[in-house]
Amino acid sequence: MTTSGLQRLARQTFGFQQLRPGQEEAIRAAAAGRDVLAVLPTGAGKSAIYQLAALIIPGPTVVVSPLIALQRDQVAALVANGVDAAEANSQVRAADRRQAFDDLIAGDLEFLFVAPEQLANPEVLEQATAAKPSLMVVDEAHCICSWGHDFRPDYLRLGAVAEALGRPPILALTATAAPPVRAEIVERLGLRDPLVVVRGFDRPNIHLAVERFTDGDAKRRAVLDRTAEAAGGPGVGIVYA
């Protein structure tokens, strides 16, 4: 697909006026069947990478996501844009979960969102395997890091899960991954010659400064002055002290 074609797909399906830095190369690599690790800051459009790549690749996509609320938000956003998607987690009725897998196997569902713990269930894994997914997405991939505060033990099984699924291309996404964490993600997931896309985390809209005050009244006045200056007029704000 040409750049203009990809831009058109993004615009027509999701209303994106243009792709952000790092998105196109990650989408192209995943759509070409290559493993990808994309490290982009929050708000940089990680979800768009797997959504657009999956729409280019024929066949269903299994998205591993650690939070039910996140799964629900992603499903709602996809459905709102006319894309067939469902979640199959512990808060979904058993009959609806079965229907979701039936739809995935029948080719009537583009995206199925599951938690890593569910894929430890042999029955769930068997159903996912029967769907022959063409792409496996691992969201919040830093959860695989064994020494991180977000560590989820079931993420360690995802490399084996990918093999059981027929080893589709793996697209791993995270906003939090220093070089050692990236290396662990690649190793634990068994990524093969992955494209690693890392984009800057500079936030020009965020300003950090330190000022020292020995007088409490002066400190309070400074906080009020800075708050009023930042607000640019009457409004509501939060001060962490």
Residue ranges and their predicted role:
Residues 33-52, 64:
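Walker A/P-loop
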Residues 129-135, 142-199, 218-220:
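Post-DEXD/H (motif II) to motif III coupling segment of the RecA-like Helicase ATP-binding lobe
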Residues 32-38, 59-60, 108-110, 169, ...:
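Pre-Walker A (Motif I) flank of P-loop NTPase domains
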Residues 59-81, 90-92, 96, 115-118, ...:
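Conserved Walker A/P-loop ATP-binding site and its immediately adjacent core
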Residues 1-41:
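Conserved pre-motif I regulatory segment
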Residues 44-47, 92-135, 143-149:
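Conserved helix/coil segment N-terminal to the catalytic DExD/H
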Residues 61-71, 230-241:
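Conserved strand-helix element at the start of the C-terminal RecA-like helicase core
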Residues 82-92, 193-199, 236-238:
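Conserved RecA-like helicase motor-core motifs
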